[in-house]
């Protein structure tokens, strides 16, 4: 029987086919703060596919959302950033400046990776709660405009 840590890593490995392309897609569709509609929709759909209840437009912000799985305590939250910065457009894999769109936005701080990494942790914890039968709530908070 796998340890808790091994099981979490197994879940993340099982989700690699979902998570890596998601990160690459976010890289290819950079959106600046409060304009991350593509990213918010992608995260929302992915959370729903993974069994989370999604609440959109939190606090009246069109690109803010949360995903919730489970019930009761403890409540464990993960923050997912997904905004890009203006003027940092860059072709994937290029080791010199090569903008996709001159002066366009880009993920200079790696939010395409950070947000998806947080999502991976939330999904792994969800599976742990499912497998163990333990109570608890997993929350994923989609954080728009973190750079603003």
PLM regions and their residue ranges:
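Short loop/turn motifs enriched for small/polar and acidic residues
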Residues: 143-145
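Acidic/His- and Gly-rich active-site-bordering loop/insert found
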Residues: 3-107, 116-136, 147
């Amino acid at each position: 029987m796998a340890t808790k840590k091994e099981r979490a890593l197994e879940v993340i490995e099982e989700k690699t086919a979902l998570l890596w392309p998601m990160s690459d897609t976010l890289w290819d569709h950079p959106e600046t703060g409060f304009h991350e509609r593509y990213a918010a929709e992608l995260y929302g759909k992915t959370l729903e596919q993974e069994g989370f209840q999604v609440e959109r437009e939190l606090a009246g912000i069109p690109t803010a959302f949360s995903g919730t799985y489970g019930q009761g305590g403890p409540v464990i939250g993960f923050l997912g950033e997904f905004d890009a910065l203006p003027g940092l457009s860059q072709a994937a894999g290029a080791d010199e400046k090569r903008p996709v769109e001159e002066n366009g936005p880009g993920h200079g701080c790696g939010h395409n990776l950070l947000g998806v990494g947080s999502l991976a942790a939330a999904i792994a914890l969800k599976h742990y709660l499912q497998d163990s039968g333990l109570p608890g709530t997993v929350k994923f908070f989609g954080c728009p405009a973190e750079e603003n």
